Amino acid sequence: MPLSHTTWAPAVKAKLNPEYLKQVAQFIQSTYREDAHIFPQQKNIFAALEKTPLPETKVVIMGQDPYHNIGQAQGLSFSVPENVPAPPSLQNILKELSTDVGPRQSHDLTSWSTQGVLLLNAVLTVPEGQANAHQGKIWEPLTDSLIQIASEDDAPKVFILWGKFAQSKRQFIDESKHLVLMSAHPSPLSAYRGFFGSQPFSKANHFLVAKGRQPIDWLK
């Protein structure tokens, strides 16, 4: 689904320069035309926005860029298809979830998205085997604006920022309205430095319930 068909489109168009949005469209067209090994599939670039409409967004989980191996990236941060082994960061997310709330078998986090969890990467495309290769190319003004749009919306939300990169996006969030949860990244390099034991899932639900919003069924 193209960006223009999502519920986020009017707010994005109001916030960003039309010339920049044209450059985004051109980048997508040229990148996928020139290289067949770009992830996720072109139709899934904006999957997070498609599956989590702005009015239904309750939680935002920031990622950096898509998984760069074949068959992994879905357009949802940290998620992989059901039949794909969980990458190390996702293994640790599920480990913390099990300790915090309970065990979840599925590696596919689509059901989180459809409950109002925006699984947003800061960079929306990646070439095969080249992590962060598209960082700084085109995407950040758009994804930064999406964080701002979610923050400017009045409904109380939880923003989950794992690691220094995600935490650099804190500047776009109005903490008088929303809860920001920060910890180390779930990567094996840092998970034992504050990610494990941080209880983001139960803390998010506690906030949502306190604000009169439906909690997330993280085990679904």
UniProtKB/Swiss-Prot annotation:
Catalytic activity, reaction form: Hydrolyzes single-stranded DNA or mismatched double-stranded DNA and polynucleotides, releasing free uracil
Molecular function terms, GO-annotated: uracil DNA N-glycosylase activity
Family matches, as Pfam families: UDG
Any one Gene Ontology cellular component term annotated for this protein: cytoplasm
InterPro entries the UniProt entry points to: UDG_fam1, Ura-DNA_Glyclase_AS, Uracil-DNA_glycosylase-like, Uracil-DNA_glycosylase-like_sf
Entry keywords, A to Z: Cytoplasm, DNA damage, DNA repair, Hydrolase
Record-annotated active site: 65
Protein origin, superkingdom: Bacteria
Subcellular location: Cytoplasm
Enzyme nomenclature, EC number: 3.2.2.27
Major localization listed first in the record, in broad terms: cytoplasm
One GO biological process term: base-excision repair, AP site formation via deaminated base removal
Signal peptide: none
Role according to the record: Excises uracil residues from the DNA which can arise as a result of misincorporation of dUMP residues by DNA polymerase or due to deamination of cytosine.
HAMAP family in alphabetical order: UDG
Family of the protein in this entry: Belongs to the uracil-DNA glycosylase (UDG) superfamily. UNG family.
Protein name: Uracil-DNA glycosylase
Organism from which the protein derives: Leuconostoc mesenteroides subsp. mesenteroides (strain ATCC 8293 / DSM 20343 / BCRC 11652 / CCM 1803 / JCM 6124 / NCDO 523 / NBRC 100496 / NCIMB 8023 / NCTC 12954 / NRRL B-1118 / 37Y)
